[in-house]
């Protein structure tokens, strides 16, 4: 069976995302508790994550930098997700606000990476 249609679907699509994390165990705990992500370790300095749609990894050797790309996650229940982020030790850096098409908030994870979560109105 040919994989050409599958490869065509994925051509030029974002395929993998890497984020810095000095404490791999802590980011695994945080993202597992808040978003239900699964992980696979590749030695002591790297773990990959699977969110059910997009894969990525956390790299202990990279430094957090400000002003990079903003990763935006989707939630069916924004308030519940915000509460889980707080409970798991994330820091809300921009409270929920409305924008054309929905609402979102921004947070930093235990490694200091800034992400956002959005929902439809």
Feature-to-residue mapping (PLM):
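A short linear hydrophobic-aromatic micro-motif
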Residues: 38, 57-58, 91-95
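Short beta->alpha transition motifs characteristic of CBS
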Residues: 59-60, 117-121
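Vicinal oxygen chelate
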Residues: 72-114
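Active-site beta-strand termini and strand-to-loop segments that position acidic
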Residues: 49-52, 107-110, 120
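Residue-level hotspots at or immediately adjacent to binding/recognition sites across diverse folds
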Residues: 3, 57-59, 68, 75-78, ...
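Short, charged/polar, Gly/Pro-enriched secondary-structure boundary elements
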Residues: 54-57, 112-114
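N-terminal beta-strand motif that seeds the catalytic metal site of vicinal oxygen chelate
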Residues: 1-26, 69-71, 120-121
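Core segments of cupin and vicinal oxygen chelate
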Residues: 11-56, 103
């Amino acid at each position: 069976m040919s994989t050409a249609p599958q490869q065509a679907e994925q051509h030029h699509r974002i395929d993998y995302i890497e984020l810095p994390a000095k404490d791999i165990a802590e980011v695994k705990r945080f993202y597992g508790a808040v978003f239900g992500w699964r992980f696979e370790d590749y030695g002591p300095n790297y773990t990959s994550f699977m969110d059910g749609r997009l894969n990525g990894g956390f790299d202990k050797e990279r430094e957090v930098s400000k002003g990079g790309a903003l990763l935006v996650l989707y939630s069916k229940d924004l308030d519940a997700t915000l509460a889980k982020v707080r409970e798991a030790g994330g820091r809300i850096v921009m409270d929920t606000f409305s924008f054309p098409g929905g609402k979102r908030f921004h947070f930093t994870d235990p490694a200091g990476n800034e992400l956002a979560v959005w929902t439809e109105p």
